[in-house]
């Protein structure tokens, strides 16, 4: 997962990503999806989260949920959970 994400971050000019959910907690099983927050930069187009999700799905054969950090409400339960359990990539 990490290598595939790193390649796509570079391709789409994103700064980094945060893996969260079952893969970050090391609780994933065969049915688990991949949950990812992308941290864009000045050259990142936020609509590219869809491209990243699709390419990861094709590469890894897993369902993928990708969000851009700016989509999250700072201080929300979701945001706090991601920040608490997330694993930085890149």
Predicted segments with their positions:
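Catalytic core of pol beta-like nucleotidyltransferases
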Residues: 1-16, 24-30, 41-90
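Short beta-strand->loop micro-motif that forms the acidic, two-metal-ion catalytic signature
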Residues: 35-39
